[in-house]
Amino acid sequence: MVTGELKSKIDNLWELFWTGGLTNPLDVIEQMTYLMFIRDLDDADNVHAKEAAMLGLPYKSIFAGEIQIGDRKIDGSQLKWSTFHDFPAAKMYSTMQEWVFPFIKNLHGDKESAYSKYMGDAIFKVPTPLMLDKIVTTMDAIYEQMEQIKSADTRGDVYEYLLSKLATAGVNGQFRTPRHIIRMMVEMMDPKADEIICDPACGTSGFLVAASEYLRDRKKQEVLFDRQNKEHYMNHMFHGYDMDRTMLRIGAMNMMTHGVENPYIEYRDSLSDQNTDKEKYSLILANPPFKGSLDYDIVSADLLKVCKTKKTELLFLALFIRMLKIGGRCACIVPDGVLFGSSTAHKAIRKALVEENRLEAVISMPSGVFKPYAGVSTAILIFTKTGHGGTDKVWFYDMKADGFSLDDKRTETKENDIPDIIERFRNLDKETDRKRTDQSFFVPKEEIAENGYDLSINKYKEIEYVPVEYPSTQEIMTELHEIEMKIGEEMQALEELLGLN
């Protein structure tokens, strides 16, 4: 988490953009992202050069010699952050605008890397030399502070903090699934080193980043020290799709700042015929758009066969089933209406999950989880694609607290069910004897089917009413008489004190 002096410096950097005339938070994030990458490029090049020297291996810097930019050849060292950050403001500005930006836009000539795809149409928007000079100085101070912290997570935390400002500013708040909820879902799914992971509505790539961090932290030896697994992790494991190009660029950069070199983040309308993915992924993690409505003619025909509806939350569930391999797993967030909606489409998608696949868990979340951006009640569905059923019983959990207050302030609290949810889900064999009055319990498939495939926890949860015992009428009347006598005695004492008798 970003706190103290580092947080203050990032806020100052944001303020520099804001007061300088860049008032669209998406533009600010984009420009910061580009500048972070330009600085990182210099740092990474220096690290690689030192490593090569220590090992006695040859190394050619990407800044070595003369570099062709347009119709001119430039001394490559001038493109290094460590060189141009000492230039006078006007020279630094012209260097950045005329040389550095064109250089990084064409850095990967293969056009297939995530970097080249999202930098290809990058535009330098810092309006004045003086503003750029202040930004570069502030960024140097931020990086110096990050080095003092000496934590592998700091880079990612800084970027997450920047992304949180999108939501704070009221822009694209719908893309912000709370980080602790994302992490809980990833922990429950426990990704493996050979997964192919997808988020078909990825936004800023929060789920993909969390999955990559989980693998780095929990399975580092297996993922990063095995050549084949590392190549898969860096280039083939993570797939994300979205319809907002700016969010795609930010999402791709988010992945790269968290150490994934070449994520497959692409512009795509996941629900349309444009998306032909079928039985491709082993794990889907998603929080698809709620309450959207689409025309039938732009929705993929095979999704409408599963449930004929215009509701995006139902269509995305049908899509997840189609995109998963047999044996593939999904953890996704849905609005409560998906669980109990009475329309034909609602029932059809729930039936498909229960009867044609293996629905494993329904975690009901309190309505304040998405505050202050939305007060909608939601749940997490976890299922495995089988294509032939397999649901025996479904595990339900009633989350009452997520570690934060459920009002608009969302301040940290001690009440937190998340560790308990993860622990219980990982030990489902110990859950079989729980009663319907407990916070979690199993419900047999037959009972769910009898109830129209209703998946709302309140349909099955039993509330234990503890009878309240009241004193007898005689006891109450006796107590009232005693109170009355005491009042009379005290009134008499007061009158004597005041000399009224």
Listing of model-derived features with the role each one plays in the protein:
Residues D42, T204, R245-T246, S272, ...:
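Conserved nucleotide-binding/hydrolysis micro-motifs of P-loop NTPases
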